[in-house]
């Protein structure tokens, strides 16, 4: 199987669908199937010409907003997309199995960090559950963090993943 991952929109749809048709026809001659990732906002549009879709049930929130609690997975972000929806293609579901730190300076998004050691109390102070303040200037992943920068640790909670899974399966089970 070959899988295409494209955040296509209504303006790029025709070009992407043409690519999918050409690739699918070529792959089928070799006995290979083509799948495509499907983002939540794409559920309201036509299905791409592929053998199956994989619905991405992650990266649902506003990553760059300081006010977001968890941009990786939030049931409240997903549920509006799955109300009264049907999709004319079989969908598998992809759930998040990763975490990251979202770094802010002066309430403005700077970068994503994947290797922050929040247990090092010389450099980080926990402010709230999942939010840390930088205590000393230092480098992390080639980025210079400054005192008072904020890092929001995001990780999907198991109970939240299960809740989203139940909603997706209940809503889209016949696909």
Where are these regions (language model features)?
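Short N-terminal helix-initiation segments at or just after the protein's N-terminus
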Residues: 1, 35, 40, 123-126
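Acidic side chains
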Residues: 5-7, 51, 148
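Alpha-helix N-cap and loop-to-helix initiation/capping positions
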Residues: 11, 15, 69-73, 156
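Aromatic/hydrophobic pocket-lining residues that form the small-molecule binding cavity
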Residues: 16, 20, 161-164
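Substrate-binding surface in catalytic domains of secreted glycosidases
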Residues: 18-118
